[in-house]
Amino acid sequence: MTTLVLGATGFIGSAVMNQLVSRDGNAAIGFVRTDSAAKQLSRNGIAATIGDINESASLRVAMSQASTVICCVSYVGDDEQQCVHVNEHGIRNIASIAAAVGVERLLYVSTAAVYGPGPFRDLPVNGAPLKPLSPASRTRALAEEFVRDAGGLVVRPHLVYGPGDRWFLPTLTRIVSRLDSVIDNGSAILSVVDVNLLVRSIYKLSTEQQFRYGSTLHVNEPVPRTVIDLLEHHARETNWTLPQSSIPRADAVKVAAQLGLDMHKIDMISLDHWFRSRLY
């Protein structure tokens, strides 16, 4: 079996590559955009191919070599044009070519952010209408449709932490530090997943005998965590200082507006985002 990983040097993609190469009987190819990224994989003994997900010729050649494609490509910034270019046009191209060349299994790593701001408590898959707010989440919701229509499997982790995380815990601690307080004693409940647990599940889902064609799954740790639990653990593991004060959410919203903080991120850490989930 040959597995092609798109976005093979990103946070999740690199962990997927490590998972694949640690397993016997699996040939793994990393699809990357630059020579430097290809050399990074080659130094670790991993085959690499260079291309762009919006450039059909290179993508077609790469996909023709694989029976399974795991797509870890995403743009999560605020540039709407880039969101459309990568998450909408790029993933549509991936889904189309996967179907055209006969890829047997296509798996796309999406996000539970497609549901919108919450609050959510024990939400099953598609237990609420999708109401994505940011350009990144809106275009990733569209990407999901392209993948499912091509018979692919969509996995929705929520907040991913672990080695290489440059978004979730850094954002959480930066906001709390700017506020110099936790919000509502850090009582908000969040679905989270360690990146190594996530990619282990991705591997199992991509190789199980009965592939879940055209399906969507929540893949997170089954028991959600409180914000204060996450912060206390981070403080113990690092030199970060956890503020000892707490403010109500309503006050935090006002202070955040004065500080110019992103209100979507305030919602993320002060409202429950608990998705009924499991690991595989």
Stretch-by-stretch model annotation:
Residues 92-135:
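Conserved Rossmann-fold NAD(P)-dependent oxidoreductase catalytic core, especially the SDR/UDP-sugar
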Residues 131-155:
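Active-site Tyr-X1-5-Lys
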Residues 166-171, 184-207, 214-218:
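Substrate-positioning beta->alpha
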Residues 201-265, 277:
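Mid/C-terminal beta-alpha module of Rossmann-like enzyme folds, strongest
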